[in-house]
Amino acid sequence: MANLKALFLRMKSVKSIQKTTKVMQMISAAKLRQVQQRLNNARMHMLELSKIIDTNVVTKNNECTGPHNKKDILLVIMSSDRGLCGNFNNMIVKFAKSYIEELESCGKNVKLLFFGKVAYNMMCSQYSSKILDVFSNIQSITDFLSFKLFLYGSGVDFNQFIGVMVLFNKFYTTILQKPTVEQLMPCNIDISVSLKEYYKYEPAYLNVLSTMSLSYILNLMYIAFLENCASEHSSRVIAMESANNNTKEMLSKLVLQYNRSRQAAITTDLIEVISGFESLGNQ
């Protein structure tokens, strides 16, 4: 009976885990759809912003190239605040460490800025002297404005660095995400010098260009953030689906084991009862 009770309690525990993983899978799937919509909107906005910049940039001597008397490179590493998403965080951490080694082998001094505390927790002991800041509670970022407030709150000035790179898990499909690095500064803006007409700027041209360039960089980073969020939710959907399937398989085995144990217990009881009757009859 003790064995049956232990099996029953274990089955109850597995059923509870199964419900939890199923709910988490449904929540992550809903969040994934929301992030995909935000990502599509951000890409459309970025496309229009790129058109404006491509139309109005008429000189190669713009402020988008950043200062040339600096050796520091800023790496913005995006992960998640929570686990239970497969190897999502492990992939970006492994990729980031490899990329940092590559930059340092070229004589570059690397500084780190983290979105999501999981990658920070995995790397802080090794790169503590290089970390500028870490942003946790990133699930509270619901739009571009809240994203900018997160960045401005850090006090990090991008113009201090000769280059700014963002490392994130790029979202391709629900089952395919890949660690990627994209260059934010110097900006890869197409330079057009054959405009049909020129424009008058108010305020001054360089001020307009500087504002547009900053907006361009922030939008690139925001899109990378959304790509990373989509990858996180996608990885969690797959991980929870796998966990749910595993609990089903485990529950099936436990039910079979429980039924066999109960059958054996019933058989044992019947044998004892029959043996008792037989012994009474013999008397």
Curated annotation (Swiss-Prot):
One of its GO terms (cellular component) is plasma membrane. It is found in: Cell inner membrane. Pfam families: ATP-synt. GO terms for molecular function: ATP binding; proton-transporting ATP synthase activity, rotational mechanism. One of its GO terms (biological process) is proton motive force-driven plasma membrane ATP synthesis. It is a peripheral membrane protein. InterPro entries: ATP_synth_F1_ATPase_gsu, ATP_synth_F1_gsu. Keywords: ATP synthesis, Cell inner membrane, Cell membrane, CF(1), Hydrogen ion transport, Ion transport, Membrane, Transport. F-type ATPases have 2 components, CF(1) - the catalytic core - and CF(0) - the membrane proton channel. CF(1) has five subunits: alpha(3), beta(3), gamma(1), delta(1), epsilon(1). CF(0) has three main subunits: a, b and c. Produces ATP from ADP in the presence of a proton gradient across the membrane. The gamma chain is believed to be important in regulating ATPase activity and the flow of protons through the CF(0) complex. Belongs to the ATPase gamma chain family. This is ATP synthase gamma chain. It comes from Ehrlichia ruminantium (strain Welgevonden).
